[in-house]
């Protein structure tokens, strides 16, 4: 098999178009013969080679074909199988239009690990959307991602904030906090906020006092009260302390953009029912949270 792979690589470098057609024909035969491992090895090697020589359209075609074989042969989301798929994901440039199709197929295949998909795959997809400067598209994948996701989400929101600092920092810091609280993941809510806050205080030198609550240190901002609200919201949600929460919302008036999310959070953690039952409220508010903030674009400048 190694000899076939080397011949295919050589042909691709010599004549990308003919090599691509030849490799596809060979893979078709292997799939019909149920030699799925051999087919995957050829497709993976061929896609990598084509990405290297900047034949991204043909590379994307082979990468998507590899996922087709994964599904046809019921490949599990094992470490090796994920490694191949995520390596190819990382080679897609932003300008390659087929990247979204690859992401869609990758997420569908990863559902072999569970109905929401594989956490490592979601984290990798989120990371690539950030690389492609589409942070809003990354958010739901950070929420569904692995243990690295929360801090990466907080960092992404900070860099998004720096691209449009006319918007208050709590607008960006609040996005992961509210999304993780809706997902009932308080640790990730805290980690994302802690990461955002560290970047913000280091680069902007705001007027703050340091405080400790339940063994957690956090800054109290004099200029940005809603940043304080976010920290205290996580603490009260952890304790499920309804009275303290009601005091908080008296002291810190709700931001209009947060009202729908907070209505659901109130119900989840404090047993406060919404005044009127709204159909599909969770789907609606998650959709609004994963869209771009007011007056901001879905673009991220990390240069």
Curated annotation (Swiss-Prot):
Its main location: cytoplasm. GO terms for biological process: protein insertion into ER membrane; vesicle-mediated transport. Disulfide bonds: none annotated. GO terms for cellular component: cytosol; nucleus; TRC complex. Keywords: Cytoplasm, ER-Golgi transport, Transport. Pfam families: GET4. InterPro entries: GET4, TPR-like_helical_dom_sf. It is found in: Cytoplasm. May play a role in insertion of tail-anchored proteins into the endoplasmic reticulum membrane. Belongs to the GET4 family. This is Golgi to ER traffic protein 4. It comes from Schizosaccharomyces pombe (strain 972 / ATCC 24843). The gene is get4.
């Amino acid at each position: 098999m190694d000899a076939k792979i080397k011949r295919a690589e050589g042909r691709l470098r010599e004549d990308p178009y003919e090599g691509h057609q030849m490799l596809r024909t060979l893979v078709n035969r292997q799939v019909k013969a149920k030699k799925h491992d051999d087919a995957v090895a050829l497709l993976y090697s061929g896609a990598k080679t084509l990405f290297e020589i900047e034949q991204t359209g043909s590379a994307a075609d082979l990468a998507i074909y590899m996922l087709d074989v994964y599904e046809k042969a019921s490949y599990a989301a094992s470490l090796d199988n994920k490694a191949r798929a995520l390596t190819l994901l990382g080679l897609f440039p932003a300008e390659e239009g087929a990247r979204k199709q690859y992401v869609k197929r990758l997420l569908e295949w990863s559902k072999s690990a569970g109905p929401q998909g594989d956490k490592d795959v979601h984290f990798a997809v989120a990371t690539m959307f950030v690389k492609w400067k589409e942070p809003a598209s990354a958010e739901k994948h950070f929420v569904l991602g692995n243990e690295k996701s929360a801090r990466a989400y907080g960092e992404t929101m900070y860099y998004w904030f720096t691209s449009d600092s006319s918007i208050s920092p709590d607008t960006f810091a609040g996005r992961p906090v509210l999304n993780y609280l809706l997902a009932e993941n308080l640790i990730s809510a805290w980690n994302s906020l802690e990461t955002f806050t560290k970047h913000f205080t280091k680069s902007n030198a705001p007027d703050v006092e340091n405080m400790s609550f339940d063994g957690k240190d956090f800054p109290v901002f004099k200029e940005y009260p809603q940043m304080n609200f976010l920290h205290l919201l996580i603490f009260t949600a952890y304790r499920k302390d309804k009275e303290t929460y009601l005091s908080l919302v008296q002291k810190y008036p709700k931001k209009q953009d947060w009202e729908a999310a907070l209505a659901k959070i109130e119900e989840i953690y404090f047993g406060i029912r919404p005044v009127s039952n709204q159909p599909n409220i969770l789907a609606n508010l998650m959709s609004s949270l994963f869209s771009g903030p007011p007056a901001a674009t879905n673009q991220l400048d990390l240069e």
